[in-house]
Amino acid sequence: MHKTPDFTAPIFLNDPAAALLQVQRIYQDNVEFLRQAMRDFVGGGDFTHARVRACYPYVRLHTHSVSRQGSSQPTNRLSYGFVAGPGRFETTLTRPDLYGDYYLEQFRLLLANHGGELEVGTSTQPIPIHFSFAEHDHVEGSLDVARRAFMRDVFDLPDLTAMDDGIANGTHEPRPGEAHPLSLFTAPRVDYSLQRLRHYTGTAPEWFQNFVLFTNYQFYIDEFIKLGHAEMAKPDSEYIAIVEPGNVVMRRAGLNAEPIDELGHAPPRLPQMPGYHLMRADRSGITMVNIGVGPANAKTITDHIAVLRPHAWLMLGHCAGL
């Protein structure tokens, strides 16, 4: 017996804000369905013959021309917010709470450049149960070994075959009748990287800023922290907070602490690639990550930070980018 949320039929919208709102509704309804099912599962509910599944929202665009809407200029003069040719393009979406501004901008540009409507609906791509948990949910840890093993029979777990980088690497070839990709990263790939960023940097992805520095020199990190703390002492600083591993938040002088600040605790030891975030209100601040030694770390962290779509990143240190 399959347990699924009420199906949300696809709708066609020419208003970017309305399209984003529909994405938010589908995602929130489906994630909350999974969270409630998980609470029931942890509480000992009978799932002997049950299979629980909820899927990501999708956005789809149909276009019949490579030309821009209302213009004779080709889209190859644009850097983003367009598709390269006629056809059907779609992608799955996740975390509209984190990506809302980004999605809204992309929806607006797609409609401005191609006209028509955006189709928003429920995809067939399952949301892995681990990707539905809220930031500080740790419900799985309360399960015994047998119940934890039974999870895979009830819920969808992360599937690495759905998280490859074929689109971003330019090697993805749609099968006959399949839509072209509308984004570099699918929803499961994004969710996977958001989870890994928590693990590698010791900070939540919500803290990351749009300008990123990487280094393998601790003295750069020390100076960055010193600079951040100095900025927090200035009531008129353009920066509003600095966040360190363990989600430890220091707010600018004159700003009140927020409830989420109480959840931060300095870890007993630093994570593999500790992250530090000097934040502006519009996310145009600076994130700095100590990638440590070795080219594998550099590739790993950039693979994951890429899903945040930062404006720029820069490596500091003569061997930091090998």
Question: Where do the protein language model's features map onto the residues?
Answer:
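Accessory terminal and edge-of-domain segments that mediate assembly/interaction
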Residues: 1-312, 320-322
